[in-house]
Amino acid sequence: MMIEYKNHKIFAFSDTHGLNYRLKIPKDADILICAGDCADEIDRFNCVDTILSRFFDWFSRQSAKVKIFVPGNHDVLFDLNPKLAIKLVPSSIVLLEDSGFEFDGISFFGAVCRPWMFTNAENKVPKGVDFLITHGPAPGHLDNNKGCKRLGEIIEESKPKFHLSGHIHELGGQSEATETTT
């Protein structure tokens, strides 16, 4: 999905599951956001460090000025061995896990929101952040009735301009609610 915002072209994607090389990234995108699940279902417990390394190598070679990554539920190394997972992320990629980042007047916040865990990000999400990025969706927005209720409350409280998520493959797309796009 391409978003034009504050004179930047932002391309967001998720759930490539090892098939990132098939993704057609627009050449004019200057900010890339991956909302998780770059690892493949079959290999998620076996060679996940190799899969993550391949993804990060591919992601870092993209021509965008900024590349942001928020892990998903298949990127299990971030849960099982976070120190190793963090070492795999090149310095050219911004890893957001319950943390924020700003670029050229655009604020981003990545919250850990995977199906089995939602951390204490609610204490950290800044009000009015431009982009809230989670892997899991909020309820009522492309979620197949599986959205995280607490995430929905956090979105109501923090009022991000955009909420980017993935996880529910069959409902990929874009929806709008009031002033927030999810």
Go through the PLM ranges and name each one.
Residues 65-68, 140-182:
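Conserved beta-sheet core of the metallophosphoesterase superfamily
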Residues 1-4, 97-105, 174-179:
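Short acidic-hydrophobic surface loop/beta-edge motif
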Residues 11, 33, 68, 96, ...:
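Hydrophobic/aromatic beta-strand patches that form the interior of the parallel beta-sheet core
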Residues 17, 38-39, 73-76, 112-114, ...:
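Catalytic metal-binding/acid-base residues of hydrolase active sites
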Residues 18-24, 51-54, 115-125, 141-150:
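Pre-active-site segment of Zn-dependent metallo-hydrolases
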Residues 39, 44-49, 127-161:
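Active-site-proximal segments of metal-dependent phosphoesterases and phosphodiesterases across multiple
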Residues 13, 18-103:
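Core catalytic region of metal-dependent phosphoesterases/phosphodiesterases
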Residues 7-17, 105-114, 130-135, 181-182:
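Active-site-proximal beta-strand elements of phosphoester/diester hydrolases
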